[in-house]
Design a protein with these regions (language model features):
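Core catalytic alpha/beta fold that binds nucleotide/phospho-ligands
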Residues: 1-219
Length: 219
């Protein structure tokens, strides 16, 4: 695979994307098998950034299932897979979360928002035209997932417990109310992602703004 330099500054992020199309062909389209096959791609990358031989790369699992590198002083990482894209985010000194979703029609987006999002978020979506509502729904969803993953929590924690504000006709999502999270919304940074046509995603972390260096890796 094309290798990204493992020399990473403490003040930056690395966002690496893998093309899952070839893996899908190998696995006959099974999402689970695609995920397992990609371990052969992202484990060597993590080993380089952690500064350990691949054979010594050890993962630990947090109380709510978030994986991390077990070696002391290792960078934090997070992984997301949807459709033909796998994203691997790596950073030092902060806990991060990343999510990516395929933009597919979701006729019940507003009903889902009314059930699982905050009342303010659902009302903001309802005020948008249908096309804008669909995209804004995915922006909110990926932002929420990225924050929950950075916290090391799953969807069961509650999508409504991390609240966002829609701006610019639903094209921008800003942290608003994280009353039930480990830090207030003002402590969080959110970076919107569009890794490929037809996809939206988000990268979330607590702390100062950092530059994000992106790499596209292929077998």
């Amino acid at each position: 695979m094309a290798a990204a330099s493992q020399s990473m500054q403490d003040s930056e992020f690395r966002l690496l994307s893998f093309d899952a199309v070839a893996k899908k062909a190998e696995s006959h389209g099974s999402a689970v098998d695609v995920w397992r096959l990609h371990a052969a791609d992202w484990r060597p990358v993590l080993a380089r950034y952690a500064g350990v031989p691949l054979a010594e790369l050890t993962l630990a699992v947090g109380p709510h299932g978030k994986p991390s590198l077990a070696a002391p002083s290792s960078p934090d990482f997070n992984l997301s897979h949807c459709g033909d894209i796998v994203l691997l985010a790596i950073a030092r000194g902060v806990e991060i979360g990343v999510d990516v979703e395929v933009l597919r029609p979701r006729p019940r987006a507003l009903q889902l928002a009314q059930r699982y999002f905050s009342a303010d978020e659902a009302a903001a979506l309802a005020a948008l035209p249908e096309a804008e509502c669909q995209q804004a729904f995915y922006r909110l969803w990926t932002a929420k997932e990225a924050v929950l993953k950075a916290l090391g929590r799953g969807l069961a924690f509650g999508l409504d417990r991390v609240g966002f504000r829609l701006e610019a006709g639903g094209t921008a999502v800003l942290p608003q109310d994280f009353a039930h999270a480990a830090a207030p919304a003002s402590a969080w940074m959110l970076h919107a992602l569009a890794p490929s046509p037809g996809y939206l995603g988000a990268l979330a972390w607590r702390g100062e703004s950092r530059p994000i260096r992106r790499f596209a890796l292929s077998p």
